[in-house]
Regions:
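Basic polycationic patches enriched in arginine
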Residues: 2-6, 14
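Short, Lys/Arg-enriched N-terminal segments with co-localized hydrophobic residues
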Residues: 11-26
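Polytopic transmembrane helical bundles with strong interfacial aromatic enrichment
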Residues: 22-180
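Intrinsically disordered, low-complexity segments enriched in small/polar residues
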Residues: 7-10, 173
């Protein structure tokens, strides 16, 4: 008869996974912001490429998928926007962190946020027009593509400005004395 023995490493693995969960639950807004801020940038890029492909190929299925992706990117932008102020409060007094960079990033992020939310609203209206087989659905989807492209550009700029807050190596001139 064979006795089953537990692998001594399994306790360590379970403890590590519980520690990871606990660490996740105890993250501050700066941690969360760093994790979620890439989603709207990459999401809007994916969405505009999918929507653009659908419109160019005149594929209603791809166009609708692109519109849903724009809508999803708009929803997923909310956590990044909601954690930004808390993240700023945490890092603003750290060494080599410029309040001017934080303010520039916040202003750029707000513009990108509202552009993406506008694109998401247009995407929702486009989907409703597609559902009712309106001839204007494609035109509104094209307008959604234009606004989604604008939002991607604004969000990418905001992301670059946000990266400069802690990554001095990407600042122009590697950080000037007035930024320190």
């Amino acid at each position: 008869m064979r006795t089953s023995r537990r692998d001594p490493g399994s306790f360590v693995k379970r403890a590590a996974s519980h520690e990871s969960i606990l660490h996740f639950l105890l993250m501050n807004q700066a941690h969360i912001h760093l994790i979620v801020n890439h989603v709207p940038i990459l999401g809007s890029l994916f969405a505009l490429l999918l929507l653009g492909a659908g419109l160019v190929m005149r594929s209603e299925i791809l166009t609708k998928a692109g519109l849903v992706a724009v809508l999803a990117a708009g929803l997923l932008c909310l956590p990044a926007q909601l954690t930004g102020e808390g993240a700023a409060e945490i890092v603003q007094d750290m060494p080599r962190v410029s309040r001017a960079l934080i303010q520039n990033h916040a202003a750029a992020a707000e513009k990108g946020f509202w552009a993406l939310e506008s694109a998401a609203a247009l995407a929702l209206f486009s989907l409703l027009l597609f559902k009712s087989a309106s001839p204007r659905a494609r035109l509104l989807a094209l307008l959604t593509l234009v606004v989604a492209t604008l939002s991607f550009g604004l969000l990418a700029r905001a992301g670059n400005l946000g990266g400069q807050i802690r990554h001095t190596e990407i600042r122009d001139g590697f950080g000037t004395p007035d930024e320190l």
